C-alpha cells in the first residue's frame, strides 16, 4: 500500500510515529522559509511542514502547486502552542515531511477548491470530478455510504434477503413516463427501465422470499424539481405474513437506528395521523410538524352572511373555508400580505382574506380588515376564539373548492413557518395512514392515489359500490414535511386486483396484456404481503442538510435531465440505429 494513514485519521495519539500520506495539495503556504502544505484526501486534511534542512525535499515542496497529487512521508508531531486548528480533525498535530514524491501534476482547476465561492452549478457539474474533491462534498458521499451500510446491516439482522430485480423490463402504467430501450433482437419492441421494482418484489413474495430488500436504481422520465432526478435510488422493502403495524414498526426501527448510528440522534415513537386529519389541520398529506400553525374550519360560522365570497363556499359540500392564525402577524406590512396573496394564487386561490387582530377588547373596532363589515360580530368572535387569536395576530382565510383551500393554505403555512422562523424543533418524523383508495377526476373517472396494487380496507363488492369513499391500507413516513417513504399492504387475491383494474378503466384485454403475469401469479397461492420504499437520495439530502438531491448524488443530471460532464444524452450513429430498426423522422439539429 502506498499510504499508511488517511489525512483525516491523524491525531495526537500518533505523535512521534512515521506516516505516509497520499493525496492532493489543498493549499500551499511559504512562511519565512518554511513551507506548509495542506494535504487532502477523502477523509480530511493534514498539515505537512517542510524545513530547509532537507534541501532536496524542501525544493520539491517549493515546486508543487494546488491539486498536485503527492506522496509524503514524515513524522507526526504536536503543533506549537496556540497554533492548533479546532476546525480540523487533525488540527492539533502536523507532519514534519522528509520525503515527497509528486505522483502527478495538475493544471489550475476551473474553480478554486480551498476558497469555494459562487461557482455556477453547471460549471460544478461539468467538472464534477473536481467538485467532489471539496471536503463538504466528500463528506456527503461518505455519510451516504455510512447510511447504506447501516440500512443493510439492520435489514440483514432482521432476516431480509438482498435480491436484485431486472433493469430491462416492460412498460407498465405507473404514473410517470418510462425510459424506453429499443430491442435489437425483437424488431419494433422496447424494454422499459423500471420506475420501481414493484411487481417483481410482489412476485418474489409469491415465490416464498418473505423478507426482501434491495437498494435499487429506478428511472422516471418526468419534469424535474429540486427533489427529483430521472434516475434515483430507492430502499425497496417487501414482506409476507406481516400487517401494516408490523411493517411500519420494522421500517420505523430502521430509520430510528439509522439516525442514531449516523447522526447520534434518538427519536421516540413516531406519531400516527390519518390522511383526513392531516389535510384538515395542515392542508398536506405530508405535514411538517415542526411548524405550529394549523388550519381551522370555520364554514359553519359563515353560512348566513351576505358576503357571497364566504356564504357560497360555506354552503357547498365540495368547498371549504379555513382560517390560519399567525401569531404576531398583525404587524405584517401590506406588501407582504400582497406577496402572500400572489403566492396562494399559484395553487388556484382567487384571493387571501385576512383579519389583523389589534385589540380584541374593542370588538370590531379593534380588528383591521376589509371583510369584518360583512360578518356579524358574534360570528367573528366565535371564529377568533376557535383559532385562538389574541392581540397582535393576523388570521388568513381561504374559501374555495376544498382541494384548492387545503393546498393553498397548506403551502402558505409552510412558507410562513420558514419566513417567520416559527419551526419549533429540528426533526419531526410521523406516519400518515388511511389514505383514500382513489382520487376522483373531473370527468368522474378514478386514479389510484398510490398505485393500482394497493389493497383497500373493504371487499371487492364494497369497493366497486363506493369507490369514492374507500380507504386503502397505505402508509407514508414523513419527516419535516418531506415524504421519506410510502408503502401499503398489497392486493394478493386475483378478484380484488381485477376489481381495482376495472375501477381504473383498465379493460380485461389491457389487464391481460400488461399485467397477465401478475394475475397469473395471484392464482397460485399468493401470500398476504406488503412493503415500503424509501427515497435514499431524499433521505441523504435531509440528513446532510443539502438543498437539493443533486448535492448528494455523485454524478447527477441537471434539471433538464442531461449530464453536462459526459454530454449525455448524445447522438448515435446511423449504423446503430439501423441495427435497432429505428429511423429518425427528423434529423437532430446541431447545437
UniProtKB/Swiss-Prot annotation:
Marked site (Important for tRNA non-discrimination) residue numbers: 31, 82
Residues binding ATP: 220-222, 229, 483, 535-538
Binding-site positions, L-aspartate: 174, 220, 450, 490
| MF annotations from Gene Ontology | aspartate-tRNA ligase activity; aspartate-tRNA(Asn) ligase activity; ATP binding; nucleic acid binding
Identify which top EC class this enzyme belongs to: ligase
* Pfam families the UniProt entry points to: GAD, tRNA-synt_2, tRNA_anti-codon
The record ties this protein, via InterPro entries, to: Aa-tRNA-synt_II (IPR004364), aa-tRNA-synth_II (IPR006195), aa-tRNA-synth_II/BPL/LPL (IPR045864), Asp-tRNA-ligase_1 (IPR004524), Asp-tRNA-ligase_1_N (IPR047089), Asp/Asn-tRNA-synth_IIb (IPR002312), AspRS_core (IPR047090), GAD-like_sf (IPR004115)
- Report the subcellular localization: Cytoplasm
Q: Which GO terms describe its cellular component?
A: cytoplasm
Which terms does the UniProt entry file under GO BP?
aspartyl-tRNA aminoacylation
The EC code for this enzyme is 6.1.1.23
**Which segments carry the region annotation Aspartate?**
198-201
Chief subcellular site?
cytoplasm
Q: Which reaction does it catalyse?
A: tRNA(Asx) + L-aspartate + ATP = L-aspartyl-tRNA(Asx) + AMP + diphosphate
- Alphabetically ordered keywords of this record: Aminoacyl-tRNA synthetase, ATP-binding, Cytoplasm, Ligase, Nucleotide-binding, Protein biosynthesis
Oligomer and partners: Homodimer.
What the record says about family reads: Belongs to the class-II aminoacyl-tRNA synthetase family. Type 1 subfamily.
Its function, per the record, reads: Aspartyl-tRNA synthetase with relaxed tRNA specificity since it is able to aspartylate not only its cognate tRNA(Asp) but also tRNA(Asn). Reaction proceeds in two steps: L-aspartate is first activated by ATP to form Asp-AMP and then transferred to the acceptor end of tRNA(Asp/Asn).
* Classification via NCBIfam families: aspS_bact, PRK00476.1
Q: What is this protein called?
A: Aspartate--tRNA(Asp/Asn) ligase
Name the source organism. Answer: Pseudomonas fluorescens (strain ATCC BAA-477 / NRRL B-23932 / Pf-5)
Which lineage do the record's taxonomy fields give for this organism? Bacteria, Pseudomonadati, Pseudomonadota, Gammaproteobacteria, Pseudomonadales
Which gene is annotated as encoding this protein in its UniProt record?
Answer: aspS
